[in-house]
């Protein structure tokens, strides 16, 4: 499938793929995770098409085939541009595809962006699905300070193993008898190998991108949202996913969502699965829950 190019508010290109069908029930807008790309969601889009939904995927800035620099978002305010890009895509779905029933799907870092989008734009979406969702952590401000300090010596466009380890090291160590440092994403060796061998996956973030990521994480803890529409939200994760933070992390996520006005929540966790539940060997269980959620009238 060819890319469709649209422009962000700063005139930078956003590359999307449109999996459109006739007379769709709605459109699922997909926000992928950190250090991956939209083509890893082809199976998801195909399955959602069969359920009667159009799908629009996109590559985040600094990700995918068409980016100028892997792991780099923008010279400044990259966190805000990542949010506005998704609003631009939503406008495309509404105004070009003429679909107003939009379900927002975010995986991992994509779920962080999705939650930041909801703070001021919740009325644009009928339902939300958050997969492998990270939670707000009190150490985020310290991480942001550390990134700022490191950038004095390496510049914002440089990379830092210290920040790589601070952000991802805990996830890697969560799998005790790991064969690779990527084992935390999945129990499926095929999926792990596909990720490792994909040149568009696993590329380190620049220092400025880590700053933007930390600012987005801080946004998860915002006290209130604007003109909240309390739509149904499905939270899904593998029980062995270190990103969610087990019960403590999940409770923090629920607490923050509730405080922002979102309490129409449904949570499903899956035994013997890690971070990328859409790519696990038992992924059909996940798709069954998604299909059930899409078909429910939870409003």
Question: Predicted regions span which residues?
Answer:
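Short beta-strand/loop motif that positions the catalytic acidic residue
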Residues: 235-237
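Active-site glycine-rich loops that stabilize anionic/oxyanionic intermediates
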Residues: 25, 32-36, 108, 239-240
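Alpha/beta-hydrolase-fold enzymes
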Residues: 105, 114-200
